[in-house]
């Protein structure tokens, strides 16, 4: 049966796990490439852009550069979001379930 007196303890555990997840995110980086590696973008798990690498051959072709940058940034952002979702589900899965109605 659900014990309301344990709610505070459960919330503290949840907050601790959320803080741990945030720290892991800041220390994780993701990289995406486009144009066969002509453009490479790295982003932290917190969504901070860390690095952009552009092959010299693209410096004369602004339109191609823009397209490849957008593609790489979108790809790395999707990786970061998928990681956040996965970590959140893992965190919630590790929490004790609320046995309401038991």
From Swiss-Prot:
NCBIfam families reported in the protein's UniProt record: DNA_YbaB_EbfC
UniProt subunit comment: Homodimer.
SUPFAM superfamilies: YbaB-like
Record keywords, A-Z: Cytoplasm, DNA-binding
Any matching Pfam family: YbaB_DNA_bd
Compartments where found: Cytoplasm, Nucleoid
Stored InterPro entries: YbaB-like_sf (IPR036894), YbaB/EbfC (IPR004401)
One annotated GO molecular function: DNA binding
Species the sequence originates in: Wolinella succinogenes (strain ATCC 29543 / DSM 1740 / CCUG 13145 / JCM 31913 / LMG 7466 / NCTC 11488 / FDC 602W)
Signal peptide as annotated in the record: none
Descriptive protein name: Nucleoid-associated protein WS1681
HAMAP family xrefs: DNA_YbaB_EbfC
GO cellular component labels: bacterial nucleoid; cytosol
Gene3D superfamilies assigned to the protein according to its UniProt record, in alphabetical order: Nucleoid-associated protein YbaB-like domain
Family indicated by similarity: Belongs to the YbaB/EbfC family.
Chief localisation class: cytoplasm
Task performed by this protein: Binds to DNA and alters its conformation. May be involved in regulation of gene expression, nucleoid organization and DNA protection.
Taxonomy, superkingdom: Bacteria
Membrane-spanning segments: none
